[in-house]
Amino acid sequence: MKRREFITLLGGAAVWPLAARAQQSGKLPTIGFLGGATASAWSNWSAAFVHRFRELGWSEGRTVLIEYRWADGRHERAAEIAAEFVRLKVDVILTSGGVLLAAKQATSTIPIVFAVANDPVGAGFVSSLARPGGNITGLSLQTTDLAAKRLELLREVVPGIRRLGVLANIGNAAAVPEIDEVQAAARILGLDVAMFEMRLPEDIASAFAAFKSGAEAIYVCTDPLVLAHRARINTLALAARLPTIYGPREHVEAGGLMSYGANFPDLFRRAADLVDKILRGAKPGDIPVEQPTKFDLVVNLTTAKALGIEVPPTLLARADEVIE
């Protein structure tokens, strides 16, 4: 999907110097917004980003232009969008870990801000969290503790679980660290893992056909393709009577059982601060990569009832949100 949107932003006093420079050059500062999934899947995240930009004082037509593009979970499309942003000479690219590689491969000069990425140092996106270097900075998620915590939550809901299904898009290099961490955590907990590596939407049905006989619950790795098809995944999981756990809460809002992870709208709000700094003259390589400190547990009781699962009261008491 291609569209150009001028974002109506209130305020503007804080960015008058930049506005004056924009008028002198005849070109508004432009943000290339590279969404890894669909516009609807990212709607809460993009809205959070824009709302924070309003608070920072940016104003429509006078100070900023945002170009939205959506990869729909397809990495080849993400590469096309990144190349387009280079041709458009955008001032900053905003994206996330699932399609961050496409942006990195497209340019080494245009600043890139990732709202969320798993282990950006290990993946080679930045030199270090404190001193990223290069043209990239953003917000990092480390999955080591998160994967183990999610499996512990699954064990509370499915006592005695022995066989774990893992659904992951192996075509996404950013998913590999999470896959490794899930397998390591499963070994520690004594769980047998049935891994299904999807690459296309058509693989989802095949995965659940395999999981029916080889899993008691499903861990779904975070990925743009998975997010774009979250409703179908949850429908198949319910039909197979399989509890699911995710990272982003959006999966649970679409019918998944549980999620445990960072609040993605909060990450996109913080990413707006980083983009703001860069548009005011800061170099991305000098802006430390940040890490979230709060993680939310969300439980969908409607899904639990449909699965015939009684969620322990002790777990519900710890939940940040319960969907009924």
Predicted regions and their residues:
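Short hydrophobic alpha-helices and adjacent helix-cap/hinge residues
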Residues: M1-E324
